[in-house]
Each structure stands twice: as C-alpha cells, then as structure tokens.
C-alpha cells in the first residue's frame, strides 16, 4: 500500500509543472516525514508524506494545509507548518523546524527531536 501511495503521488507531481525528483527525510519519535522536492527555477516543496508512530502506510498531506515558511537547500533550513481543520484521516496540526541535520517536530503539545537527512 505504501508503494502504491508513493507511486500515485509521484505521478501526480510529475504531471504538474513542478517535477519532484528528490526526497528529504525526517525521523524522530516514531514519526517519519518525507518531503518531495521539485524544481522550477529553485527547489520547492512539491509533496509531503507523513507516517505517525506504529503506522504502516504514508499519509499524503494536502497542499492547502501546508505552509512553507523557509526552505533553503544550500543553508539546509526548513520551517514548515501543517494545519488540520478537524479531518480525522489526517494527522493533527504540526510544525517542523530543521537546521542542518537537527530537526524538531511539534505535534500534540510535544516537541520531538529527530534527524533530518538532506542527502539526495
């Protein structure tokens, strides 16, 4: 199922004007966030996948709930917020802050420290 969702998302992104070709990864506290990077003139966040602790399948986060405040591949910084308006099929609202290889996920009143992989 995870592979199917991943392939479906890649097809959707590839058919748009932004082509996602690379992925960045957060791991911490059982949470995994995969960020697909697309390119127009500069790198952009094209799609985000989320897996909570104990889950087997990725959840594709809708772009209308995502706010990318900072994203700089050269400086290796990312600040991203996800807002959930009471959809039980999606994760709770969260924020992810990344500086180089260190990351912090704030969700459900907890701050979870983790690693961020910028290697593409």
Regions found by a protein language model. Give the residues of each.
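Sec/Tat signal peptide C-region and signal peptidase I cleavage site
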Residues: 16-20
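Central antiparallel beta-sheet cores of small beta-barrel/beta-sandwich binding domains
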Residues: 21-89, 94-120
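Sec-dependent N-terminal signal peptides
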Residues: 4-14
